[in-house]
Structures are given as structure tokens and as C-alpha cells.
Amino acid sequence: LVGIINFGAYIPKYRLGADTIGWHSNQERSVANFDEDTVTMAVAAGYECIKGFDRGQIDGLIFASTTPPYSEKQCAAIVAEALDLNENLFTSDVTDVLKCGTTALRSAFDAISAGSCGLMLVIISDSRQGPPRSETERNSGDGAVGFLLGSHNVIAEYEGFYSVTKNLLDNWRSNGDPFVRTWEDRFAIEEGLENVLNDAISAYLLKYNMKPSDFARVA
């Protein structure tokens, strides 16, 4: 029985919203302070996640982000040291793509299922910047979430995984670009997400001998 044992989150207190001059949207967006980045937010989320647990039992930490503060330096090691975890734990960074969070979770679940790790901490943290007044700017709030994964006392069981990989030009940020760039939404949805979702869901149901009525909710 492998799954999520606990979780914790951190959302910066500052906001861009309806009262912000030049915002032009009723949507509210969380904004990291000048002294915050994805590593500091990851530390805060990780602390909330492992509060009350024996840190010495955690033997793996994966940090996932599309916006790490370093181009070449492991952020997971910084987070592990800030959380006072064991020096002999496994650490890894997963970056450069929006599915880095689910990739990190699957890697951790696979490691636990294989017996190479017992307790693993996965922290997903992001601070994506879109061009001014863009959909990306309005919809990409800053924040972090941590998951403690293991095989005992789980609150959400991991039952299976299926993925479909297709190259799609929807969101990207080239080396040195300050902002995320996007392609035509209709193309990304109609030619990309709809097809990929249908393929992935159909294959998942077939692989695990399930049907849509077996699910109360889909997110």
C-alpha cells in the first residue's frame, strides 16, 4: 500500500488583484516577496508537510520546478539542509516542464514500490512569469506544495499511473527569456490536450480494468 501520508503548502501573502493599479482583472494572483524564490517557498511547504514526523526516517527528497533559482546547482540539496534532513538521503531536481510535479511524484512512488526508499518528500514549487496583461500572468500564482509519501498510514492510496507523451508547442521559455511564451490556445487544446487526455484516460481504464463510473471525481 503506497500513497500520500501527509501534505503541506505555502502561498506568499502578497497579491495582485482588482485593487492593483494596471492589473485589469478581477482574478487574484499570489506574488512572492523580494526575498523569496522557489527554494525558500519549497522549504516553507516542506516544513509544513513533515511537521510532527521523524525527519530521520525520510530517505529521499525530490524538488520539482520550472523556475529554479539556479541554472546549474541542485536545489533539493539546499532544501534538504534547510529542513535538517539526513545527509545520506537521495536527492534530485526535476525541472523544465509543467509536468515536473507529476513526474517527481511518479518517480517517488516507483522508488517506494521498488523498496529503494521508505519515506520520500516531494516538493513542487513555482514562480512563473508571463508577459504583462497576459493570461499566463493572471493565471500563474506563486506557491509551493509538499507531499510526504510512504507505505504506512497513507491518507490517499496510489493505485496506478499511465502517461502519453506527445510533442506540443503550447507553452515554452527559451534560455534567457524572462517570460513564458504561449501559442494559440485553440490549437493547444483541440490538437493537443483533448487528444492526449482521451488517449491517456482510455488507456488507463483499459490497463486497470476500470470504467468512468468507478470515479467520484476527476481533477
Could you describe each region identified by the protein language model?
Residues 1-38, 134-202, 207:
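Condensing-enzyme catalytic core mediating Claisen C-C bond formation in acyl metabolism
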Residues 29-40, 67-119, 125:
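Conserved catalytic cysteine-centered active-site region
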Residues 45-59, 198-214:
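Phosphate/pyrophosphate-binding loops at sites that engage ATP/ADP/AMP, CoA/4′-phosphopantetheine
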Residues 60-67, 93, 218:
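Short glycine-rich or small-residue beta-strand-to-loop segments that form or flank ligand, phosphate
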Residues 89-99, 103, 133-137, 182-189, ...:
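Cysteine-centered functional microenvironments
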Residues 113-146:
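Flexible, glycine-rich active-site loops centered on histidine and acidic residues
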